[in-house]
Amino acid sequence: MKFLQIIKHLKLQNKKNALDNFVNCRTYEHISNINKLFLNNFSSTKEHSEHGQVKHENFLNNTLQYGENSQNGSTNNLKNGKYNMYVSEGNVNINEEKYKDNNISSNNTEYNNNSSNSGILNDEGPLWKEHIDDVVNENKKKKMNRFYLDSQATTMIDPRVLDKMLPYMTYIYGNAHSRNHFFGWESEKAVEDARTNLLNLINGKNNKEIIFTSGATESNNLALIGICTYYNKLNKQKNHIITSQIEHKCILQTCRFLQTKGFEVTYLKPDTNGLVKLDDIKNSIKDNTIMASFIFVNNEIGVIQDIENIGNLCKEKNILFHTDASQAAGKVPIDVQKMNIDLMSMSGHKLYGPKGIGALYIKRKKPNIRLNALIHGGGQERGLRSGTLPTHLIVGFGEAAKVCSLEMNRDEKKVRYFFNYVKDYLTKHLDYIVFNGCQINRYYGNMNISFLFVEGESLLMSLNEIALSSGSACTSSTLEPSYVLRSIGISEDIAHTSIRIGFNRFTTFFEVQQLCIN
């Protein structure tokens, strides 16, 4: 009830420090005081009625201050994206010059910050030793003694994304499909702006190409079931799908469901590096093949498939090509035109956006790609995904895509440095370790390691202050060895010894040091 009162009473009296403790609750120190804090700073709704909306810009500029109580006494402004990060002088020493790499492939060269540091590694050390955009202060992470390195399971919301979402969780609450008044128009525009941001991230051409869903699982189901059932109805002979043995579970389970409906599925085995051979795909295509689906970046071992050549092959053979890019979007450059991608699944919470929102890209081309809807109702999303759109989640998803477009190059340099740092340290200090998956064609924010003779689950339990995983979060409740590792030829015993480490935009050097030391 108190939270409802917060939304209702939106006028501020003491704007200066209104949300300090709320933002600082990430340290779990002020949670019990949040309601009291807000109720003391919100009073009436007069300001809301002036122009139909609160002056959110002034509200944030005056209230969202972060870090005034930090150990160095500095004040960081959440709205402007300025955050101080302090790196511990730990006991781990690796030659940083070795990892300087300014030639990383990316189509993003601009950075949305006011710092002179634009992502270049200089002689003083890696870029994240400077003042960079990072929501969590290094000293606070030390104080919490809890470190998150499970970024393939989910990522934290970027503060710029949260900032963009807040108005749509409070006073901009119209239904995007209410076409008769300002509230609906305002929400509809926000949704279309988010579509544009997603298109810009992947080089799409038309806003109608983006269909919002609840996440990558729904997007994958809609792509596979929607396409196969539609084209099979037109031609009963068309009933063949090609995929790989190392897809995400939601692809594999959807294919198994289609098999119960009479469809034929070919599961291709990758090589020992986790890469599917182009010749194997070519040899699997038959006259009755409808589509091929291959994961862009593998969620367990981080390997990047040869998506462009697969797309070209599918175009040449006149079959549809779908890719699950939930681990790739916002992290590696994607050009759906150049790569000839017909359908692509994305997820908000894998690129520093909110959970519960995803999208399916469907290319506009001639002849048009057709598919059957899975959810029926009011006809939203061009009739392919009925249901009221969650405007705040869509806005967050779109803003996350926009931020990724600006910062992908710098993020890639950061995670690549951490990957090489950990790899060199472990190789130097430990015997009997294996780095799984191709070490070249990969996303460097994902590291999968087998520690021979050490049970992976036991290792995770011994590192209880560091969040890691032994595989996909969707299957982590089982004690079975990773089916991905088994598919690339790793024995069951060794597969049981593997753990996955995930670096991200907000990973700090101190966290990486603690991982290595422990």
Describe the residue ranges of each PLM region.
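A periodicity- and composition-biased signal for non-globular, repetitive helical segments
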Residues: N21, N61, Q71, N77, ...
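Residues marking helix boundaries in flexible regions
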Residues: I7-K8, S32-N35, N95, S105, ...
